[in-house]
From Swiss-Prot:
The active site is at K124 (n6-amp-lysine intermediate). Disulfide bonds: none annotated. This is DNA ligase B. It comes from the Bacteria. The lineage of its organism: Bacteria, Pseudomonadati, Pseudomonadota, Gammaproteobacteria, Enterobacterales. Coiled coil: none annotated.
C-alpha cells in the first residue's frame, strides 16, 4: 500500500511540474547556462553566510535554485544542495536536522495523511533553523542548522535573544530542541505583506560580528523536541511552561487535508507575530532521535503558500499594434500559476519600455498580479547567456492607418476588428481575436466592415469557427446593423469619448461631416487638440470611403 501511495504522490508531483520542460539547448549551451547560474547562486550563498547579507529576495533565490536543479537534471549534472552549508560549521548537532519534504498540493497532502494518525499542523515560520541544547537546566549550546549534521556555534548570539529562555526545568532540563529563529513582527498579515525577505534579515543579524541590541528583535519558534514526551499535548504544555509559548499557541490537531487547508488559509490572512511561507503537518509519533538524518523525515511534510510572485522564463518577445497604431511589446512565458491563474503572457508596454527592461527570450523574469488580476513584470532576475532580441516593426502606424487590410497592416487591422466587436461598441458576442483572425485569413476582408457581407454558408465553412457557432455569429452580425449611429462612429475610431459623442446630438453622417472644429471643441472633455483630431479624422480618405460603404449598406445614420 505504501508503495502505491508513493507512486501516486510521485505522479502528482510530476503533474505539477509538467510545465517545467527541459530547455532545447546544445550541450555546450547547457553547460554555460548552468555554470553561470551556479556561480551566481554561489555568490549569493557566500554573501549570505560570510557577511549575513542578501542581494536577492528569498523567494527569487528559492525559485532560481529550483530552476538550476531542474536544468542540472535535464542535462545530467549533479544537483546542488539548496543552501550552501556555513563555511565554518564544525559543531555537531546532538540530533540531526532532517529538513522537510514539500507537498505540491492538497491532493498530495491528503494521500500522505491517509496512512498516518495523530497529526498536527504548525505554521512554517520563515527564519533560520537552530538547535538549542539545554544541560542541567541551562542553555548549553545553540547551533545553526548548517548542513543538518554540523553547524556554527551560535551560543553567544542566542544568549542575547531575550525571547529564548536561558534556563528551563523539569523534562526540558536536559533536552535538545529544534526550532526557527525569526524576525518578530506585530500583526504580520502574510497575504498582504509577503515575505519581506525575513530569512535574509535574520541571517544578517546572526552573522554580524558585533553583539547588537537588534538581536532582541528576534524570537524563536520550537517545532521539534526529539525524544520528548510521547503525547503532543504534553510536549506543548511543557514548552509553554518553559517560555516557548508560541509553539502551543500555533500547533493544532488535524484529521484531514481539508482541516489543514482551513488552518493554512486562516494563517495566510491572519495577523501573526512572524513571517510564514506555508504550514508543516507532522505526526506526533516520531522515531528515536538517533535515526534522524538530513532529508529522511517521513513523519512531517510542508505545504507552502503559492508565491505572490513567480519566476517565469521568457519564451518569446512579440509585438502588437493597437487600433491607435501604438506598438506594444508582449512577453510569452513558460506557464506559471499565480493564485488560481495560469499566466503565459505579460504585457511589457512600449518598445522604449521593453528596451529599458532589456528582456530577451531565455531570460527569467519575476511576475506578479496587479489590480484585477492582470500579470505584470516586477523584475528581470536572470539573463541568459545567449540573448537574441527581435527587431521591432517600423513605427509607421497611427490612429488613421489600417482601416483597409494589407500585409503591413495585419496587426493593427485585427486590433480594429477586436475593438469594434467589443461590448461597448457593436457588441458582437462570441468572437474575439482568434475568431477575427480566422475570418480574415479565410475571407480576406477588404476593410474593417467587410464581415457584414459574409453569408451563413461562408461562416459555416470557415476553418477555426465551429459550425454550431457560425449561426450565432451570423445572427450577431445582422443585429449589428440595427446598432445606433453613434456605435458605428465609435467602431470607425472617432477620437471622442462616448459621453462627448452622445452630447453632440450628431445622428447622421452628413451632419457629422459638416460640423466645425468650434462645434467639437465645446463638447465636454474635448479641448482644441482633440477637436483638431476629429477634423483630421473625418477628412481622412479611408474614413470617407468607409462612410460611403456603410451608406450603401443602409446602416442607420449613413443613408444619403
Amino acid at each position: 500500500m505504501k508503495v502505491w501511495m508513493a507512486i501516486l504522490i510521485g505522479i502528482l508531483c510530476w503533474q505539477s511540474s509538467v510545465w517545467a520542460v527541459c530547455p532545447a539547448w546544445s550541450p555546450a549551451r547547457a553547460q554555460e547556462e548552468i555554470s553561470r547560474l551556479q556561480q551566481q547562486i554561489k555568490q549569493w550563498d557566500d554573501d549570505y553566510w560570510k557577511e549575513g547579507k542578501s542581494e536577492v529576495e528569498d523567494g527569487v533565490y528559492d525559485q532560481l535554485s529550483a530552476r538550476l536543479t531542474q536544468w542540472q537534471r535535464c542535462f545530467g549534472s549533479e544537483p546542488r544542495d539548496v543552501m550552501m552549508p556555513p563555511l565554518n560549521g564544525a559543531v555537531m548537532h546532538p540530533v540531526a536536522h532532517t529538513g522537510v519534504r514539500k507537498m505540491v498540493d492538497k491532493n498530495a497532502l491528503s494521500l500522505w495523511m491517509r496512512e498516518r494518525s495523530d497529526l498536527w499542523v504548525q505554521p512554517k515560520v520563515d527564519g533560520v533553523a537552530v538547535t538549542l541544547v539545554y544541560r542541567d537546566g541551562k542553555l548549553n549550546k545553540a547551533i545553526s542548522r548548517g548542513n543538518g549534521l554540523k553547524g556554527e556555534d551560535w551560543t553567544q548570539k542566542v544568549s542575547l535573544i531575550s525571547a529564548v529562555p536561558q534556563t528551563v526545568s523539569g523534562p526540558l532540563a536536559n533536552s535538545t530542541l529544534q526550532g526557527e529563529i525569526f524576525l518578530q513582527r506585530e500583526g504580520h498579515i502574510q497575504q498582504q505583506m509577503g515575505g519581506i525577505n525575513a530569512r535574509a534579515k535574520v541571517a544578517g543579524l546572526m552573522m554580524r560580528q558585533d553583539d547588537s541590541d537588534t538581536l532582541n528583535s528576534l524570537g524563536v519558534f520550537v517545532w521539534a523536541w526529539p525524544d520528548g514526551p510521547q503525547l503532543m499535548s504534553d510536549r506543548l504544555k511543557e514548552l509553554a511552561t518553559a517560555g516557548f509559548t508560541l509553539t502551543q499557541t500555533y500547533t493544532r490537531a488535524v484529521k484531514n487535508a481539508d482541516e489543514v487547508a482551513r488552518v493554512r488559509n486562516e494563517w495566510w490572512k491572519a495577523e501573526l507575530p512572524f513571517v510564514t511561507d506555508g504550514v508543516v503537518v507532522r505526526a506526533a509519533k516520531e522515531p528515536e532521535s538517533r535515526h534522524w538524518l538530513p532529508g529522511q523525515a517521513e513523519w512531517l511534510v510542508a505545504w507552502k503558500y503559492q508565491p505572490v510572485a513567480q519566476v517565469a522564463e521568457v519564451k518569446a518577445i512579440q509585438f502588437a499594434v493597437g487600433k491607435s497604431g501604438k506598438i506594444s511589446v508582449v512577453a510569452s512565458l513558460a506557464p506559471v500559476m499565480l493564485d488560481d491563474k495560469k499566466v503565459q503572457r505579460v504585457n511589457i508596454g512600449s518598445v522604449r519600455r521593453w528596451q529599458e527592461w532589456d528582456i530577451a527570450p531565455g531570460d527569467q523574469i519575476l511576475v506578479s498580479l496587479a489590480g484585477q488580476g492582470i500579470p505584470r513584470i516586477d523584475d528581470v532576475v536572470w539573463r541568459g547567456a545567449e540573448r537574441t532580441k527581435p527587431t521591432p516593426p517600423e513605427n509607421r502606424f497611427n490612429s488613421l492607418t489600417c482601416y483597409f487590410a494589407s500585409d503591413v497592416c495585419q496587426e493593427q487591422f485585427i486590433s480594429r476588428l477586436v475593438w469594434l466587436g467589443a461590448k461597448q461598441v457593436l457588441g458582437l458576442d462570441g468572437i474575439g481575436e482568434a475568431g477575427w483572425r480566422a475570418l480574415h485569413q479565410t475571407h480576406r476582408f477588404e476593410h474593417i466592415f467587410s464581415w457584414l457581407l459574409l453569408t451563413p454558408e461562408q461562416l459555416q465553412n470557415t476553418p477555426g469557427i465551429a459550425k454550431s457557432k457560425s449561426a450565432q455569429l451570423w445572427h450577431q452580425f445582422n443585429l449589428a446593423r440595427k446598432q445606433p449611429f453613434t456605435r458605428w462612429v465609435m467602431a470607425m475610431g472617432i477620437p471622442l469619448t462616448r459621453a462627448a459623442l452622445n452630447a453632440s446630438d450628431e445622428r447622421s453622417w452628413s451632419q457629422l461631416l459638416f460640423s466645425t472644429e468650434q462645434f467639437w471643441q465645446q463638447l465636454p472633455g474635448t479641448g482644441s487638440g482633440r477637436a483638431r483630431q476629429v477634423i483630421e479624422w473625418k477628412e481622412n480618405a479611408q474614413i470617407k470611403k468607409l462612410g460611403s460603404w456603410l451608406a450603401a449598406q443602409q446602416i442607420t445614420g449613413f443613408e444619403p
